């Protein structure tokens, strides 16, 4: 939806949150990666059969209900697989009895253990990004606070996004901060 709004604003010259996008993009760029976890989306929509070689694992881990599946086909929640607070999340997972692949919140054996996470991190390390935003349509919430690692303008950016998207600014529970 965000990229559609951007394209429409570019075509018509309209504003997004009081910003003329064409002028903005002449000075800056925007990189959009539409979906980091396509197999997870397919599993959530179409069940364990969409997991290919991992269908048995997905079926067993989900007990046949994949409607709330958030992990990749290997049962790793990619939001928990980045090397940003991974050790703390791993500890919280253990405290909640999460030791192995699961529909959500299992961060993998080590940070960037999953090809999706590793490729995204490699791409980001190869670029100079001043800001990074991650959109999650589930819940229609904007998480902007990351403790001591929260960038300076995060709150302001979240306020602009909330005003333009209708999503609520929110703080996730501790185990969901990945």
Please identify what each model-predicted range represents.
Residues 1-146, 151:
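Active-site/substrate-binding loop(s) of hydrolase catalytic cores
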Residues 109-110, 139-178:
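Catalytic cores of processing enzymes, dominated by hydrolases/peptidases
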């Amino acid at each position: 939806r965000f990229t559609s709004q951007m394209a429409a604003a570019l075509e018509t010259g309209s504003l997004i949150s009081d910003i003329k996008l064409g002028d903005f993009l002449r000075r800056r760029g925007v990189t959009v990666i539409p979906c980091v976890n396509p197999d997870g989306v397919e599993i959530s929509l179409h069940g364990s059969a969409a997991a290919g070689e991992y269908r048995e694992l997905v079926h067993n881990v989900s007990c046949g209900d994949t409607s709330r599946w958030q992990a990749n086909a290997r049962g790793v929640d990619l939001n928990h697989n980045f090397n940003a607070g991974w050790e703390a999340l791993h500890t919280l997972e253990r405290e909640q009895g999460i030791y192995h692949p699961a529909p959500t919140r299992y961060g993998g054996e080590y940070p960037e253990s999953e090809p999706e996470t590793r490729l995204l991190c490699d791409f980001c390390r190869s670029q100079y990004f001043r800001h990074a935003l991650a959109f999650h349509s589930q819940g229609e919430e904007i998480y902007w606070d990351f403790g001591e690692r929260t960038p300076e303008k995060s709150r302001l950016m979240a306020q602009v996004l909330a005003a333009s998207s209708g999503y609520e600014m929110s703080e996730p529970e501790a185990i969901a901060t990945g």
